[in-house]
């Protein structure tokens, strides 16, 4: 469950169902058990584009920018009118404005990740999902992405996040769910996620 303005983190060792959960929410998995509801609407059997139209924005694992489009074309491709527009995205990521006429394929890995986050925000989502948004990035870019996530939190953006950076998650997330073999084995607020629990379920 993710409430308005909350950051909720999914934790678990590799292969325990975190990304599968994300894919199921976004309509990218055809077979799973259980119910998924968003704003009182069942997401079961809905195509992914319909789920996006309901207000779920996904930043997928692996920096999937549209490589044959420019930065600007990427940002406006699926834009929805709202608070997040080109001006606000460029304020968040000044490098994107500098590179707006370049092809996405010419950007560095960190810049591509900024672009994918910006593109998701341009849909003005009610829920933003970040799947390993800082993985494989340089330490400097990771710091920048975490600062952006903090800004989004302060702007009351609802976020569901998967990330291996437990320290940053403990600072920012309101609530945690720990998954093991596709099932929730622990959930609670960050202040109750003790080192004992982390060691038991996460090995950290």
Model-derived segments and their meaning:
Residues 26:
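Helix-to-loop junction immediately C-terminal to a conserved catalytic motif
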Residues 11-13:
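The feature captures the beta-strand-to-loop junction immediately N-terminal to the Walker
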Residues 103-107, 111:
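Conserved ABC ATPase signature
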Residues 128-132:
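Catalytic Walker B motif of ABC-type/P-loop ATPase nucleotide-binding domains
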Residues 120-121:
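ABC ATPase C-loop
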Residues 34-42, 54, 82-84, 88-91, ...:
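Conserved ABC transporter NBD signature motif
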Residues 30, 42-63, 86, 98-101, ...:
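ABC ATPase NBD coupling module
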């Amino acid at each position: 469950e993710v409430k308005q303005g909350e950051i909720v983190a999914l934790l678990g060792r590799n292969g325990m169902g975190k990304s599968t959960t994300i894919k199921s929410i976004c309509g990218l998995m055809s077979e799973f058990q259980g119910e998924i509801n968003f704003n009182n609407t069942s997401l079961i059997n809905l195509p992914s584009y319909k789920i996006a139209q309901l207000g779920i924005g996904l930043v997928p694992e692996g920096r999937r920018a549209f490589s044959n489009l420019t930065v600007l074309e990427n940002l406006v491709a699926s834009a929805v009118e709202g608070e997040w527009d080109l001006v606000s995205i460029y304020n968040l990521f000044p490098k994107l404005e500098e590179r707006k006429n370049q092809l996405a394929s010419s950007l560095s890995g960190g810049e591509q990740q900024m672009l994918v986050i910006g593109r998701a925000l341009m849909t003005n989502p009610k829920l933003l999902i970040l799947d390993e948004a800082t993985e494989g990035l340089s330490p400097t870019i990771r710091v920048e992405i975490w600062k952006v996530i903090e800004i989004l939190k302060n702007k009351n953006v609802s976020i569901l996040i998967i990330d291996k950076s437990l320290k940053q998650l403990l600072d920012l997330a309101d609530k945690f769910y720990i998954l093991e073999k596709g099932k929730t084995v622990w959930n609670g607020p960050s202040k109750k996620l003790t080192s004992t629990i982390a060691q038991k379920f996460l090995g950290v």
